[in-house]
Design a protein with these regions (language model features):
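N-terminal, positively charged/glycine-rich alpha-helical extensions of SAM-dependent methyltransferases
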Residues: 1-59, 67-72
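Conserved alpha-helix/loop element of class I SAM-dependent methyltransferases that forms part
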Residues: 60, 65-88
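Class I SAM-dependent methyltransferase SAM/SAH-binding core
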Residues: 93, 98-148
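A short acidic, Gly/Pro-enriched loop at the edge of an enzyme's catalytic core
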Residues: 150-158
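A short SAM/SAH-binding and catalytic strip from SAM-dependent methyltransferases
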Residues: 157-170
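A short glycine-rich, Lys/Arg-flanked "PGG" loop and its adjoining helix->strand segment in the class I
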Residues: 172-188
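Conserved class I S-adenosyl-L-methionine
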Residues: 190-226
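Substrate-binding/catalytic lobe of Class I Rossmann-like enzymes that use SAM or dcSAM, i.e.
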Residues: 218-259
Length: 259
């Protein structure tokens, strides 16, 4: 059953006003879905505080993925699957955002070219400036949507999604046709991704588990950044807020694993 609007949504609007400002909220008052998605990752994002940036969270992810809290998924993937590569690889990264992972990979001699595809030109420009500063010449940047990109004319040794696949519609078609079309026969697909409920419509059991976890955290660590509010519980996310904030957010995420 869909939750259209919840207390969580009202609280989030208040928090976003304090963290990202009125201009960010006003950017959502448009019928242009692409502009909404782009604004979700604008410069004001730096004024937010997100749980996935917590070092201990990252260490746990590393441990769950690689077995070692100090080894991230990129290093693990390179060592386990690419160490025997016969020639430098050509990579396509879809929804690359700020390209922080691609900039790290580009420093590895295994990669001949990494094509970063994203709809946010500002983020790509920032990444290009960082690449120039680091002396990296094997990164290229393409500001297009997946509908505009010509998959048929390209061939890649590897295609990667890093927290971006859940922003694409019709995951089955994207992976089964478009990605398959541009991936070489022995090519690899790397996915580091949120694979939960579409539009974050978590079940009652999941919400209960989240609230149980919240109660384990001491109050000082539950204060919402740049506000005087403390997180006491999670009410569930409303479908409408997710859509208005970013129409691409978790749009087909429930189908990632089945695909």
């Amino acid at each position: 059953m869909k939750r259209w609007i919840t207390w969580e949504d009202l609280i989030d609007v208040y928090v976003k006003l304090h963290q990202r400002g009125i201009r960010f909220l006003l950017s959502k008052l448009t019928f242009n879905s692409t502009k909404k998605s782009i604004s979700a990752f604008d410069a004001s994002l730096g004024g937010t505080s997100n749980w996935w940036e917590i070092p201990l969270i990252k260490e746990r992810w590393n441990r769950m993925i690689t077995g070692d809290s100090q080894i991230d998924f990129k290093s693990y993937f390179i060592n386990k699957y690419l160490s025997g590569a016969q020639s430098p690889l050509r990579v396509l990264s879809l929804g690359s955002g700020y390209c922080q992972h691609e900039l790290v990979l580009a420093s590895c001699p295994l990669f001949r070219e990494i094509v970063c595809l994203d709809i946010n030109q500002g983020n790509l420009d920032e990444a290009a400036a960082q690449a120039k500063e680091k002396g990296l010449h094997n990164l290229s940047f393409c500001c297009k949507s997946i509908e505009q990109y010509d998959f048929a004319s390209e061939r890649f040794d590897m295609v990667m999604f890093n927290n971006s696949l859940h922003h694409f519609r019709d995951v089955r078609t994207l992976l089964g046709k478009k990605i398959k079309q541009c991936l070489k026969p022995e090519g690899m697909l790397l996915i580091n991704e949120y694979v939960g409920a579409t539009r974050f419509q978590f079940s009652r059991m999941q919400i209960q588990a989240i609230n149980k976890a919240i109660r384990l955290i001491d109050k000082p660590y539950r204060r919402r950044y740049k506000t005087s509010l403390y997180k006491k519980r999670y009410y569930g996310t409303g479908w409408l807020r997710v859509f208005l904030a970013d129409p691409s957010e978790a749009v087909d995420s429930a189908n990632i694993m089945p695909a």
